[in-house]
Each structure stands twice: as C-alpha cells, then as structure tokens.
Amino acid sequence: MQKIGIYPGTFDPVTNGHIDIIHRSSELFEKLIVAVAYSCAKNPMFSLKERLEMIQLATKGFKNVECVAFEGLLANLAKEYHCKVLVRGLRVVSDFEYELQMGYANKSLNHELETLYFMPTLQNAFISSSIVRSIIAHKGDASHLVPKEIHPFISKV
C-alpha cells in the first residue's frame, strides 16, 4: 500500500509557507494530497474553486502531489484516500494548542490517523494567509509572500 499523507487547509490564499511545507512533506510520502477545505466558517476571500486553482498552479512542479477540494470531516477524507498521516504546520504556540485539539479530535474519529507537525523555515515563520489577506485588503503588495503563480489572483482583489 502506498504511503499517503494529507495536508489540509483553507489556503486562502496559498502562501510561500504552505509551499515550503508541501515541498518538505512531499519528500516523506509516495503521494501527498493537498486538501482544500470548503470552510464557510472562515468567510474566505477567495472561492473554493479559486483556492483549488491557486494551489494546483503553485504545486504543478511536484510529481507526487494531488490537490483536491473537500467539504466535511477530514477524518473521512483520510479514510477515502487510505491515508494514515495528516500534515500540519505550526508557527506559534497558539497554533500548537489548536492543532493538538484537532489532532486528538481526528484521531477519535479515525483511530489509525496520526498528525505530523512541521515547523516553518525561518524565512516563512511569520507568513500566514491572514496576514496576506490583510495586506491585500489594505492595497499593499503581498507578492513576496505568495508563489508567483498566484500573483494574478491577488492582484485582482
């Protein structure tokens, strides 16, 4: 059976930090599923279709990465793909507190599921989609924080 990991997120928008985690985690799995969450609770700046398209463009150079959109429980998506490992990024202590709870919740729904946490590289430690959205909303230039493939998306906002 193939070693498959899932890296879930809203990716609103995808950042250089996300791509760094995709790059590093894709080296650990035969296949990495990047799962773009519907997430109406977060009131996304970009539609699900746009977010999926952005992540597909930004990851087109990765041979073992597949991007999918999903709605519902991540634990169920993991079962569908026969995945036993979730990939998550941790920038700050508050991320850890949230991710620890989510990891336990996912494990309670799918007992085979483990969560693998990645720390960002130093140059990406401060980058978040929230910061990028804030810069964009205030008409600032966030192009240095996101992959070049998505510059057309952020310039339209």
UniProtKB/Swiss-Prot annotation:
InterPro entries: Cyt_trans-like, PPAT, Rossmann-like_a/b/a_fold. It is an enzyme of class 2 (transferase). Its cofactor is Mg(2+). ATP binds at residues 10-11, 18, 89-91, 99, 124-130. The record marks 18 as: Transition state stabilizer. It comes from the Bacteria. Pfam families: CTP_transf_like (PF01467). Its EC number is 2.7.7.3. GO terms for cellular component: cytoplasm. Pathway: Cofactor biosynthesis; coenzyme A biosynthesis; CoA from (R)-pantothenate: step 4/5. Homohexamer. Reversibly transfers an adenylyl group from ATP to 4'-phosphopantetheine, yielding dephospho-CoA (dPCoA) and pyrophosphate. This is Phosphopantetheine adenylyltransferase. It comes from Helicobacter pylori (strain Shi470). The lineage of its organism: Bacteria, Pseudomonadati, Campylobacterota, Epsilonproteobacteria, Campylobacterales. The gene is coaD.
